[in-house]
Amino acid sequence: MAGRTFLRFLNSFRHTGTPSSSTFLRGDGAWSNLETSVEDFHAIGGAGEPAFQNSWANTGSSPAAFYKDPFGRVYLRGNINTGASGTVAFTLPSGYRPEYNTFHVSYNNNGGPGPGGAAVHIEIQTDGDVIPTYGAGTDVWLDSAHFRAV
């Protein structure tokens, strides 16, 4: 297809380690990889990072964290617990917040997914507040939450 340029994006979210992103460009020849640098995760509760609020804390082997990819999408990860349902767990900083309130569905692992687990509603507000709401159990997985930041 002469005269056409195609772009293909690959955004890889690795549960542990550093996220990666690649953009592949193809004109009239072969695909070319334009590697894009992606920031490291920001650990909730880490030095210079947002603090936990309302008794929320990390639990298990996947600490709460977030990052923004080169396309402006913010991704959360980790497992938190001990906070009261419907309270602010932490607040994302400016530049990592959604334009509109966003709502995500995850689960708590009180017994694991399936019969032992329960649905969790995670609201991320325009002021950066991250608010998990659940009916039973205390552990909340954040990995399903991602949105475009403004």
Pin down the residues of each PLM region.
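Short hydrophobic/aromatic-rich beta-strand motifs
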Residues: 25, 65-67, 74-75, 104-106
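Extracellular jelly-roll beta-sandwich "head" domains, especially the C-terminal globular C1q domain
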Residues: 58, 81-94, 98-150
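Extracellular repetitive beta-rich solenoid segments
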Residues: 1-35
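Beta-strand residues in well-ordered beta-sheet regions across diverse protein folds
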Residues: 34, 75-77, 133
